[in-house]
């Protein structure tokens, strides 16, 4: 699947190492390979954006290496491809040897996988399913400040799906564990690949059922009900959390404005 980059090769360049992206001038490199000193490097074509190929190059640059979060405000499709590149780069870096027999592995030529030529085992990129849910109570939405978010951002509740658990069960458990309340009328909304480090966010909306807010201090700094027209600092546009909040606000406006 990989190839040597030639002088006139052009497109979008995902240059990644250890979950970081090369972002010269704060942007994803776009244009001729020669302009970015990429000629002669090995590259994987991982998609297409605006009619041009998107290439993954497994390489560390001394300067301008940053987080994929820095491109979250770009188009959702390009952010998704950047996230794919970062996750694949880390997958290839961390799967050089077979976890069963210890022999060297090599990339598959037909799919995103690493193969062991000794025991013939096959490894795929790990994807961790998560739930994220906006909870509405009449004209208000439940928003929380997470321990890991010290920047004042308030967002909806989220968490990882456990082994042997359905998405619906995960929503009920996470909401109860983090806030102490029960929800009802759960509705699936959308999903978003989230490369921090390798999650797939499954987004839901739900209605408050019963209980009083009792936060888990290991997870949350605070949680409260906020009226739809008086909200605190929110997650940035482009995140599925922001989408859920905006959808909830729209529903409240339709009923209470």
From Swiss-Prot:
Annotated binding of a divalent metal cation 3, by residue: 174, 178, 219
InterPro entries xref list: NAD-cap_RNA_hydrolase_NudC (IPR050241), NudC-like_C (IPR049734), NUDIX_hydrolase-like_dom_sf (IPR015797), NUDIX_hydrolase_CS (IPR020084), NUDIX_hydrolase_dom (IPR000086), RNA_Hydrolase_NudC (IPR022925), Znr_NADH_PPase (IPR015376)
Cofactor detail note: Divalent metal cations. Mg(2+) or Mn(2+). Binds 1 zinc ion per subunit.
UniProt keyword annotation of Magnesium present: yes
Domain Nudix hydrolase per the UniProt entry, residue ranges: 125-248
Reaction equation(s) it catalyzes: a 5'-end NAD(+)-phospho-ribonucleoside in mRNA + H2O = a 5'-end phospho-adenosine-phospho-ribonucleoside in mRNA + beta-nicotinamide D-ribonucleotide + 2 H(+); NAD(+) + H2O = beta-nicotinamide D-ribonucleotide + AMP + 2 H(+); NADH + H2O = reduced beta-nicotinamide D-ribonucleotide + AMP + 2 H(+)
Domain of life: Bacteria
Binding site for a divalent metal cation 2: 174
Cofactor(s) of this protein: Mg(2+); Mn(2+); Zn(2+)
Molecular function via GO: magnesium ion binding; manganese ion binding; NAD+ diphosphatase activity; NADH pyrophosphatase activity; RNA NAD-cap (NMN-forming) hydrolase activity; zinc ion binding
Binding residues annotated for Zn(2+), in chain numbering: 98, 101, 116, 119
Top EC category: hydrolase
Motif Nudix box boundaries: 159-180
Function of the protein: mRNA decapping enzyme that specifically removes the nicotinamide adenine dinucleotide (NAD) cap from a subset of mRNAs by hydrolyzing the diphosphate linkage to produce nicotinamide mononucleotide (NMN) and 5' monophosphate mRNA. The NAD-cap is present at the 5'-end of some mRNAs and stabilizes RNA against 5'-processing. Has preference for mRNAs with a 5'-end purine. Catalyzes the hydrolysis of a broad range of dinucleotide pyrophosphates.
Family: Belongs to the Nudix hydrolase family. NudC subfamily.
Oligomer and partners: Homodimer.
Protein name: NAD-capped RNA hydrolase NudC
Gene: nudC
